[in-house]
Amino acid sequence: MLIYYSLGNFQSLQRKEATLLGGMAKVTIKKDFKGARIVDFDMETLVTDYRLGGVRVTDYFDIITTYPWSKYSRAIAESGNIGNGNANFNLDYMFQLQAEQAAQVHEARRKAGLE
């Protein structure tokens, strides 16, 4: 059994630490005469990046981008607004959180015999 869950929107303006990193499920299902089964799964970490544009029309950031972790760099992070105003969410915390997330996926893949 494989379970991915989401308790919110793909992108949000929430300031809670747990909402600033997310993931996109990658699941391979094989279907044949025996039935359907999961033959592979993984997850790509996603980062929500907040920027201020030229004109402020709300109290929120007006440029919000979701990056795959593989395309998110320290330079991008340092030039943006890490944590959307949450002082507890800094660059080091983000890397720690991503490492924990990756370890959970790795352990699930190991238990499934995929690593």
Which residue ranges define each predicted feature?
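Conserved beta-sheet core of the metallophosphoesterase superfamily
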Residues: 1-25
